[in-house]
Amino acid sequence: MAPFLKLGALLVGNLEAMSYGTSLTLFDPYIVNGQRVFMDTCWLPALDSAGIDVFVEAMDTAASAQCAVFTHEFKGAASRVPAHATAFGLRCDHVLVEILATLFDRSNKKEEQRHRQWARATRQAFSPIALPGGYPNFLVAEDADRVAKSYGANAERLIAAKRRYDPDNVFRSANPLPGVNAGLP
């Protein structure tokens, strides 16, 4: 955190231990029905100086004050569980980068495009230092290559389970699987 704290005056900040359930409620005040949110994601092997430079540049060029870049560290148990034991394919220490561009006025197509482009450009700026794929919860089926890389060797096993337990693709709005879009392959 030290490099971030040297960037300037901290407007809002809190570092403390909390339960997982409590952490899930932290952003509730900012999740408002009717707003438009563009999301993107990538994984970094670590948050080093190159990643911090991209982070700072992204926020310097943010489309609005409602844009944000969050990081979540995956370490400890998240990297000790064997990849074949769960659906989650990346089982090494890494940092999840979550990119959000929020727009309250859904009628302004120019601003919508500007926010969408900022999210995309931010992820692309991380690309040279990013790991393949991204956090599956934040990916869309149209990004098939990144979806496939996110699940790694688990993809085929997950697709087989999907075919078996959801042959009618009832849960099609859930996390995308490689090759599973509107219908099953």
PLM features per residue range, with description:
Residues 1-185:
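Soluble FAD-dependent oxygen oxidases
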